[in-house]
C-alpha cells in the first residue's frame, strides 16, 4: 500500500501546485482520466481474488475520493483568484465623473421635448393620455370613422397595407391616431377627455412629409360639448405652446369624414428670414384640423348622438416642433445626426412645466 500512498501524495502535491484551471485539468486527466494512474489501479481489481479485491478496492476508492475532493477545493480557489484578478483589473473609480465634458453629453430629441410639452399643457386642462396599436384594422382606421368605400385614403398609394388574410381582410399601419379615439369611445362611457399621441404612417416622403410621422389628437365627449369649448381649448393651447401672451386664430370651414362641421385653424404670425414669430404680424399659418364629432362616428362607437356630442382635433407633432424651434426639413428629425441633435436638442433633466416654462 505504500505505492498507493506515495501516488496519492504525489497527485495531491500536483493539485496544490496547479497555478491555473488548465494545469489543474491536466492533473485530473493524469490521475482520473481514462488512462490515468488511479484509473489504471482500478482496472487491476478484476485480476485479484475476492478478499484482496475487497481490501485493495476500498483503499483505491479512498484515494480516488481524496483526489476528487482536492480537485474540487483547488478549482474553487483558482476560480475565486481569477475573479479577484478580473475585478482588480476592472476597478472603477466612483469618484470620477460619469460623463465627458458637457459638450459631449446626450441631448433630448426635439420630438420628445414637444411630446412632453403637449402632455404638460393638456394635463393642466384635465386631459388624460390614451394610446393604441400602430397596426390597425380597416374597421377602426376607416369604417368607424365614416370613411366611405372608395375614399382616396383607402388606396394603396396613401396607406401601407399588409398582405390579405384568408378571409380577404387586411391589416394596415394606422394613417392617423383617430383609431385610438374609436377604441376609447368603445371602452369608456362619457364624459371623455383624452389626447392621443403616437406614430402614424402614410406613403409619402419629401421635405415636409415622411412615411412615418407623429401626431396628437384630442377628443372630448359629453352631453353639453360645443364649438365654443373647442375654440377655447385650442386658443389656450396655442398660447401655452408657443409661449405668447395672446394669439389670434382663424377658423376656416373644411371637410373631414369624421367631423361635422369641420374646421381648419390658422394662427397669426410674422415670417422672418430665419424664424416665425407667433402672436403678431399679418401672415396666417395653418396648424391643425378640428371639428364636432360626426353623428355617424358616435353611432358606430355605441353612443347616442341625440344624447352625446363632442369635438376632436389633430395636429402633426413633427410640424409644430419645426414651427416652434425653427427647423426647416422634416427629414432631419429622423437622420440621427449628432451635430443636428446637439444644436436642437434639450437637456435630459429639463422637464417641461407650465409653471417653470415649457422650453426654458
UniProtKB/Swiss-Prot annotation:
- GO MF entry, a single one: magnesium ion binding
UniProt xrefs under Gene3D superfamilies = Bira Bifunctional Protein, Domain 2 (3.30.930.10)
Record has Translocase as a keyword: no
Q: Does the keyword Ligase apply?
A: yes
Any Pfam family matching the protein = Phe_tRNA-synt_N
Q: Name one GO cellular component term.
A: cytoplasm
What coarse category fits the chief subcellular location reported for this protein? cytoplasm
| Bound cofactor: record note | Binds 2 magnesium ions per tetramer.
Task: Give the Enzyme Commission number.
Answer: 6.1.1.20
Q: Name one GO biological process term.
A: phenylalanyl-tRNA aminoacylation
Cofactor(s) essential for the protein: Mg(2+)
* Intracellular or extracellular location(s): Cytoplasm
Residue ranges annotated as transmembrane are none
Alphabetized UniProt keyword annotations: Aminoacyl-tRNA synthetase, ATP-binding, Cytoplasm, Ligase, Magnesium, Metal-binding, Nucleotide-binding, Protein biosynthesis
- Please tell me where Mg(2+) binds in this chain: 260
Give the similarity note: Belongs to the class-II aminoacyl-tRNA synthetase family. Phe-tRNA synthetase alpha subunit type 1 subfamily.
The protein's assembly and partners: Tetramer of two alpha and two beta subunits.
Q: Which PANTHER family match?
A: PHENYLALANINE--TRNA LIGASE, MITOCHONDRIAL, PHENYLALANYL-TRNA SYNTHETASE
Q: Which protein, by its recorded name, is this?
A: Phenylalanine--tRNA ligase alpha subunit
**The organism of origin for this protein:** Rhodopseudomonas palustris (strain TIE-1)
Gene that encodes the chain: pheS
Amino acid at each position: 500500500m505504500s505505492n498507493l500512498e506515495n501516488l496519492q501524495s504525489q497527485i495531491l502535491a500536483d493539485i496544490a501546485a496547479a497555478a491555473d484551471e488548465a494545469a489543474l485539468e491536466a492533473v485530473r486527466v493524469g490521475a482520473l482520466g481514462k488512462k490515468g494512474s488511479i484509473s489504471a489501479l482500478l482496472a487491476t481489481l478484476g485480476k485479484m481474488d475476492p478478499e484482496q479485491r475487497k481490501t485493495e478496492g476500498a483503499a483505491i476508492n479512498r484515494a480516488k475520493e481524496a483526489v476528487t475532493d482536492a480537485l474540487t477545493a483547488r478549482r474553487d480557489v483558482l476560480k475565486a483568484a481569477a475573479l479577484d484578478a478580473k475585478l482588480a483589473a476592472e476597478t472603477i473609480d466612483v469618484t470620477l465623473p460619469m460623463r465627458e465634458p458637457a459638450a459631449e453629453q446626450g441631448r433630448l430629441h426635439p420630438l420628445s421635448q414637444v411630446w412632453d410639452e403637449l402632455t404638460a399643457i393638456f394635463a393642466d386642462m384635465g386631459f388624460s393620455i390614451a394610446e393604441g396599436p400602430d397596426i390597425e384594422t380597416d374597421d377602426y382606421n376607416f369604417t368607424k370613422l365614416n370613411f366611405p368605400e372608395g375614399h382616396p385614403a383607402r388606396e394603396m398609394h396613401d396607406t401601407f397595407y399588409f398582405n390579405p388574410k384568408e378571409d380577404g381582410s387586411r391589416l394596415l399601419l394606422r394613417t392617423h391616431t383617430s383609431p385610438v379615439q374609436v377604441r376609447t369611445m368603445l371602452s369608456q362611457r362619457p364624459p371623455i377627455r383624452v389626447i392621443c399621441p403616437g406614430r402614424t404612417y402614410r406613403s409619402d416622403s419629401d421635405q415636409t412629409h415622411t412615411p412615418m410621422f407623429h401626431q396628437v389628437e384630442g377628443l372630448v365627449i359629453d352631453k353639453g360639448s360645443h364649438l365654443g369649448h373647442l375654440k377655447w381649448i385650442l386658443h389656450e393651447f396655442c398660447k401655452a405652446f408657443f409661449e405668447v401672451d395672446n394669439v389670434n386664430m382663424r377658423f376656416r370651414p373644411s371637410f373631414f369624414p369624421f367631423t361635422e362641421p369641420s374646421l381648419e385653424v390658422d394662427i397669426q404670425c410674422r415670417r422672418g428670414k430665419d424664424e416665425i414669430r407667433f402672436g403678431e404680424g399679418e401672415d396666417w399659418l395653418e396648424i391643425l384640423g378640428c371639428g364636432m364629432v360626426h353623428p355617424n362616428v358616435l353611432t358606430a362607437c355605441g353612443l347616442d348622438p341625440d344624447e352625446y356630442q363632442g369635438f376632436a382635433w389633430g395636429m402633426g407633432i413633427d410640424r409644430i416642433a419645426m414651427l416652434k424651434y425653427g427647423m426647416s426639413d422634416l427629414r432631419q428629425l429622423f437622420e440621427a445626426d449628432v451635430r443636428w441633435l446637439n444644436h436642437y436638442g434639450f437637456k435630459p433633466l429639463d422637464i417641461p412645466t407650465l409653471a417653470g416654462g415649457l422650453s426654458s
